[in-house]
From Swiss-Prot:
It is found in: Secreted; Target cell membrane. Expressed by the venom gland. Residues 51-75 form a propeptide. Residues 1-22 form the signal peptide. Keywords: Antimicrobial, Cleavage on pair of basic residues, Membrane, Secreted, Signal, Target cell membrane, Target membrane. This is OcyC3. GO terms for cellular component: extracellular region; membrane; other organism cell membrane. It comes from Opisthacanthus cayaporum (South American scorpion). Belongs to the non-disulfide-bridged peptide (NDBP) superfamily. Medium-length antimicrobial peptide (group 3) family. The keyword Electron transport does not apply. Amphipathic peptide with probable antimicrobial activity. May act by disrupting the integrity of the bacterial cell membrane.
Length: 75
């Protein structure tokens, strides 16, 4: 309980005090740098997956045709 009280008092001080401007500016700069980084990480994974699927599609089509040919020979 004392920990929560200390946290509330310290956050209230940072909101009111003039010295806290540098603290909040640093937090804002860090957040503004992290948000695009996280967004790019998720978007690049989906692009890579699409590229991989496009690269292997012709190979899979040839494999399917070969498997169908072998199955027709067995029947």
């Amino acid at each position: 309980m004392q920990y929560k009280t200390f946290l509330v008092i310290s956050l209230a001080y940072l909101l009111v005090a003039d010295e806290a401007a540098a603290f909040w500016a640093t937090l804002a700069k860090g957040a503004l740098k992290l948000i695009p980084t996280i967004a790019n990480a998720f978007s690049s994974k989906s692009k890579k997956r699409r590229e991989i699927n496009n690269v292997f599609e012709p190979y899979h089509e040839n494999l399917d045709l070969e498997l169908e040919r072998f199955l027709s020979q067995l029947q």
